[in-house]
């Protein structure tokens, strides 16, 4: 059995490339390095809640669900959501911690996915299916990229 510590990570980077950058495997620091100038990052008011089964077994797929609420966006209404295993900004993908992403909410198998919200929509729920390839505890974190009325567009 693998015990998980699911933590809430509400403060994240709020700057990115206008129109998004597409789904991919990304470290969190990508927010400053590949989406824009790190000096324009700011704290998000979004609330992120990450959940999973209480007990997870080695080699058996499990689902992690992320609910993001209180979302503020720019005119493009694009948000980017991360599933991470570390808060250092590098080597923080689930694969870095020995987990395989079998699928994501957009039909791929990456830790960073983008969603375009409809007008008036200020929340979304997404999920990833993962499988642990090694025994031991793992902490998971969620992070978000988005723009807002007073910030750089994304």
Where on the chain are the PLM-derived regions?
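Bacterial N-terminal signal peptides
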Residues: 2-10
């Amino acid at each position: 059995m693998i015990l998980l510590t699911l933590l809430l990570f509400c403060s994240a980077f709020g700057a990115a490339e206008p129109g998004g950058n597409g789904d991919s495997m990304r470290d969190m620091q990508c927010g400053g390095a590949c989406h824009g100038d790190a000096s324009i990052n700011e704290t998000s008011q979004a609330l992120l809640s990450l959940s999973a089964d209480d007990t997870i077994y080695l080699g058996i797929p499990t689902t992690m669900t992320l609910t993001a609420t209180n979302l503020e966006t720019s005119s493009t209404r694009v948000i980017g959501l991360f599933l991470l295993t570390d808060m250092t900004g590098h080597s923080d993908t689930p694969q870095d911690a020995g987990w395989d992403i079998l699928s994501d909410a957009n039909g791929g198998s990456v830790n960073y996915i983008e969603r375009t919200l409809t007008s008036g929509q200020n929340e979304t729920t997404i999920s990833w299916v993962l499988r642990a390839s090694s025994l031991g505890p793992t902490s998971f974190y969620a992070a978000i990229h988005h723009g807002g009325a007073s910030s750089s567009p994304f």
